[in-house]
Curated annotation (Swiss-Prot):
Its EC number is 3.5.99.6. Transmembrane segments: none annotated. HAMAP family: GlcN6P_deamin. This is Glucosamine-6-phosphate deaminase. One of its GO terms (cellular component) is cytoplasm. PROSITE patterns: GLC_GALNAC_ISOMERASE. The active site is at residues 63, 129, 131, 136.
Length: 262
């Protein structure tokens, strides 16, 4: 696991963008796994600013709320249109359909999309309880795309995006942990002290379904970009346990970057 420590959100955004740019430029028809929420906003802004050529890029999104219309400003369909899809010409874009009449069939359909479009680079944030996507503690590590009931802590964390608590959806469709782990490369970004406990578990905790992010300990090609606050609870020996890089150039010089992981 690579760890790149940054000082500011701007540095995180630039580093994340450079990693995406490398994949897009070196793969013939790349597939990017996209995340939503506040974590990737700076990265998406860099993609817009630099007018990244996404004409060969397919995207697959991690998740979507159930029963939230696509045109709702809090839906992830709307989020992706606003952040990227209305600004850059992608080859193809996929977001789970939380309005589907048969949600179980939608999950199967989305698994088929993932099988047909293997993810070259998956972007992830990390929840305060260690969730990735909407995969909460206790989710089986081999889970496929599925329907989940959102925990109260996750709903509270997302309340800031809604006018009132009762507007926050109770369920979502999410790529499963097993689906996420099929990505050839994973980029996880974390900023701020609120993520410190989860990042500590990710890097130093036991491999356990009690903290979904710890599954990444078994993935062969993970990069964590985090600030000092997010790493503040980690031991001083963390750089010895993982490969710490100090610039994005150091990271891109790693021969594994952009390669297919087994």
């Amino acid at each position: 696991m690579n760890i790149l420590v940054v000082k500011t959100p701007e540095e995180l955004a630039e580093a994340g963008y450079k990693l995406i740019e490398e994949v897009v430029k070196t793969k013939e028809n790349p597939t990017l796994g996209m995340a939503t929420g506040s974590s990737p906003l700076g990265i998406y802004a860099e993609m817009r600013k630099n007018k990244l050529d996404t004409s060969r890029v397919t995207t697959v999104n991690l998740d979507e709320y159930v029963n939230l219309p696509h045109e709702d400003k809090n839906s992830y369909h709307y989020f992706m249109q606003e952040q990227l899809f209305d600004h850059l010409p992608f080859k193809q874009t996929y977001v789970p359909n939380g309005m589907a009449s048969d949600l179980e069939e939608e999950c199967k359909r989305y698994e088929g999309i993932l099988a047909a479009n293997p993810v070259d680079l998956q972007i992830l944030g990390i929840g305060e309880n260690g969730h990735i996507g909407f995969n909460e503690p206790g989710t089986p590590f081999n889970s496929p795309t599925n329907i989940v009931e959102l925990t109260e802590s996750t709903r509270q964390a997302n309340l800031r995006f809604f006018e009132k608590e009762e507007d926050v959806p109770t369920h979502a469709i999410t790529m499963g942990i097993g689906s996420i782990m099929k990505a050839k490369q994973i980029l996880l970004v974390a900023m701020g002290s609120k993520k410190a406990e989860a990042v500590k578990e990710l890097l130093q905790g036991a491999y356990s379904e009690a903290c979904p992010a710890t599954v990444l300990q078994r993935h062969p090609n993970v990069t964590v970009i985090a600030d000092q606050e997010a790493l503040s609870l980690c031991s001083e020996a963390i750089a010895d346990e993982h490969r710490q890089v100090f610039t994005i150039s150091d990271l891109l010089s790693d021969s594994r970057v952009g390669e297919t992981a087994n």
